[in-house]
Amino acid sequence: MEFNISQLKWTRKPQSYDIKEDKIEMITKPYTDLWQRTYYHFRNDNAPVLQMKTKEKYFSFVVKTEFESHQRFDQCGIVMYLDSENWLKASIEYENEAFQRLGSVVTNNGYSDWATTSIPASIKSMWYRLSRREDDFCIECSNDGQVFQ
């Protein structure tokens, strides 16, 4: 599967963006998120999503994110999005000056499940590798783009 910016489509556009062959930059509007029915009893499906469709059943892609978080719940990550009720994301969510949460959210049939681990708030970039093997998906992360866990 080749990356081709002409195949990218917005589900929802951010406040501003710049797309190049080797880099995508975006600034989101405040209070945007992807989240569905869970313990917190609220639903959000208003975050910007830039997608590329594929019929491939076996693929992996790697993305490096760089971000500046300032307020609690600021997030930066990647998403595989089918519709508002079925998607998965990997992201870092800022909590405070001491720590933030590296996590994944899997949403299936409208219900989100969030798994996290705390990491230092000083981390301002993260590599993600998402892989699909038919109906199975794997999310991995890396600090250096070489060693993924």
What do these predicted regions represent?
Residues 1-149:
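Extracellular glycan-recognition regions
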